A protein has these predicted regions:
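Acidic anion/phosphate-binding donor-loop and adjacent secondary structure
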Residues: 2, 105-106, 138, 147-149, ...
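Donor nucleotide-sugar binding/catalytic pocket of nucleotide-sugar-dependent glycosyltransferases
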Residues: 8, 27, 95-98, 116-163
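Nucleotide-activated donor-binding/catalytic signature segment of Leloir-type glycosyltransferases, i.e.
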Residues: 222-240
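Short hydrophobic beta-strand element within catalytic cores of glycosyltransferases
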Residues: 277-280, 290
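Conserved acidic donor-binding segment of nucleotide-sugar-dependent glycosyltransferases
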Residues: 292-293, 297-304, 313-318
Length: 356
């Protein structure tokens, strides 16, 4: 019963409808940030020139769609313009932090941080996919006072997961393998998983690893696997579609996430929903989904020895692995159901509107 409009970043200076997703209109327009660490004067001048034109078009959209609640998924520059729109039309303003947008705050210059701090304090509600992410925002933006904040994770595509069959990703895979998936960058900690394979091998346990994903660290990781004598135990598949990754999850022995930093990694919930045991780094929002010994195993960050110990236990103790998988699946299907999360969104909107 709610009318929804999606607004996305675009290259065009004029507001236009780009497409429709499930009959939901998607509009786009280029929004210029009023601040820039590289070109501060240029950013300010261009924003001043285009600001009236931009606001007129956004006001037209707000009137046409009768907007009474705006949910922003990335702070700048959208928060600047829709924050002003809130002053004109009233309504409820939500700002959501997903992960990198919070972790990268410390890289922004002081002007950008001051602007974000000011706008966050004007928001009706600040949402974070994890409680630790909200704490990160408050620690970086020292002195910021979030009037209201809530933790609300993203949902897992449970209907898609149920429809995916094991084996869709191909048959040229080890019979029993560990899976890790993601962008191959230093932050994802794939190097730690490879180091854990070497340590497990030194203890007499040979583990097979499948890596789904690509990125700038691929060649370094291949070189590392050769140098550590486990190249025959690691299979790099390159980029895979989301459906292929889900299929790999359904056929793997267990899922591994050894990241050095995360927000609330949805890939863990997806692996759990696929009925697989999970082992992950004890960082950021991960402990909010992986409850050590109950829905998965947590290991200290950047500790390949502890990771090796956890992997060996998962692979050798079948009863323990199956218990984690069962309890993790129940947790994921209950807590990361999109319908339940949508009801929580609506509850937050109604709560904020009642306090206006």
């Amino acid at each position: 019963g709610h009318n929804i409009t999606i607004f996305v970043a675009d290259r065009e200076n004029r507001l236009r409808q780009i497409e429709a997703l499930d009959e939901i209109p998607v509009y786009g327009m280029y929004l210029r940030s009023p601040v820039s660490s590289q070109y501060p004067l240029r950013a300010m001048v261009m924003c001043c020139i285009w600001f009236p034109i931009t606001m007129v078009q956004l006001i037209w959209l707000a009137r046409k769609k009768r907007l009474d609640a705006v949910l922003i998924q990335y702070p700048l520059p959208a928060m600047f313009y829709f924050g002003i729109l809130k002053r004109v039309f009233g309504g409820t303003l939500f700002i959501t932090y997903q992960g990198n947008d919070a972790h990268d705050l410390c890289l922004w210059d002081r002007r950008e941080q001051r602007l974000v701090r000011f706008l966050l304090e004007k928001a009706d509600l600040v949402l974070g996919v994890s409680r630790t992410l909200l704490a990160k925002v408050e620690s970086v933006l020292q002195g910021v006072h979030l009037r209201r904040s809530r933790q609300l994770p993203n949902g897992a595509p449970l209907d898609v997961i149920r429809a995916v069959k094991a084996g869709e990703a191909g048959s040229d895979l080890p019979p029993s393998y560990l899976l890790t998936a993601g962008h191959l960058i230093q932050r994802k900690g794939i190097d730690l998983v490879i180091a854990a394979l070497r340590e497990a091998k030194e203890r007499g346990v040979v583990l097979q690893l499948v890596v789904a994903g690509d990125g700038p660290e691929r060649e370094n990781l291949i070189r590392q696997s050769c140098e550590q004598g486990v190249s025959d135990q690691v299979r790099f598949l390159g980029n895979q579609s989301h459906r292929q990754v889900l299929s790999l999850m359904k056929t793997c022995l267990a899922f591994v996430l050894a990241s050095r930093a995360e927000g609330m990694p949805l890939v863990i919930a997806e692996a759990m929903a696929c009925g697989k045991a999970v082992i992950a780094s004890n960082i950021d929002g991960v402990p909010e989904i992986v409850h050590d010994g109950t829905t998965g195993i947590l290991v200290p960050a950047e500790d390949s020895g502890a990771l090796a110990t956890g992997l060996i236990r998962l692979c050798s103790d079948v009863a323990f692995r199956e218990t984690l998988a069962k309890q993790g699946k129940e947790w994921a299907c209950r807590e990361y159901n999109w319908e339940a999360i949508a009801h929580r969104y609506l509850g937050f909107i109604e709560e904020c509107q009642a306090h206006r």
